[in-house]
Amino acid sequence: MKVLLFVLSLFFVTLSFAQDSTKVKLKEWVGVLTVTEKFADEKNWTAAEQSIVGEHFQRLIKMKEKGIVVLAGRMELPVSDPNMQGLVIFYAKDEKEANEFMMNDPAVKNKIMNAKVVPYGIAVSACK
């Protein structure tokens, strides 16, 4: 009986490791967002653009809750400042998926923001 329990426990341990090895390891990426030239001038913002940026923010929150987004934020600079950028650190399996993630952002799709995707590696983090 002890042998049977031992063999069964080995089977289940092996099975659990086998399942982990089939998972695709996600890579870290950073999406760099910049405001398009038209919207660098705050006079060009309407309620429609404000609403789209609200959708952009809600999407980031939803993706954070799903474990895709690690963190997202923007520099505390005026929209008109050429150095102003937003950053999104997130997980994707490959460059294609990373680009799709950023290009499907409502602010990017509606040409309010431009997005660039770069491979990234988190070295130190307090994020959980």
Question: For each predicted feature, which ranges?
Answer:
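Conserved, structured core segments of small domains
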Residues: 19-128
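Bacterial Sec-dependent N-terminal signal peptides
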Residues: 1-22
